[in-house]
Structures are given as structure tokens and as C-alpha cells.
Curated annotation (Swiss-Prot):
Core subunit of the mitochondrial membrane respiratory chain NADH dehydrogenase (Complex I) which catalyzes electron transfer from NADH through the respiratory chain, using ubiquinone as an electron acceptor. Part of the enzyme membrane arm which is embedded in the lipid bilayer and involved in proton translocation. Its EC number is 7.1.1.2. This is NADH-ubiquinone oxidoreductase chain 4L. Belongs to the complex I subunit 4L family. It is a multi-pass membrane protein.
Amino acid sequence: MPSISINITLAFTAALLGMLMFRSHMMSSLLCLEGMMLSMFILSTLIILNTQFTMSFIMPILLLVFAACEAAIGLALLVMVSNTYGLDHIQNLNLLQC
């Protein structure tokens, strides 16, 4: 495995560990999620370019579309929660609260 793939895999792992460690605040979770999506995009693009599999050139573009939708929904949810509660804690998203 080339060193660039190892570095991108380490970036994905670091973003995943950041997501697990800083899961109490929504903004840090969204940033870690974006880091994971970016590393997945770069890794999938490198794999497609190395294997020259022409039928899957659309996959990185679809991944970017889903990442943009995820970011937009996440930021809208962050604005809604911060306007309602004044905090960005994920514990405010509990649907069982009355």
C-alpha cells in the first residue's frame, strides 16, 4: 500500500477517533464527520484512478453530493438547536424528552 493511502487511512481513523472522543458537542462532531467524508472521497478517487475502472468514476461525485447534503442538514440542525436551547450539546436532541 502506498504511503498516500496509509496517510489518508490514518486521517480517517483520526477523524473517527475525534468523533468518538468529542461527541458531546455538535459542531466538533460535524467537523469530524466532514473529515471522514473528505478522506473517503480522496481514498475512493485514488483507488479508482489506480485500478482504471471506468464504470465507477461517478462514485466520488456521489460521495461529494452526499457529503454536501449531510453538511447542510447538520448545519441546519445546529442552528435550530442553538437557537432553541442556546447550546450545541447533542444531549439536547433526545426525542424522548417532553
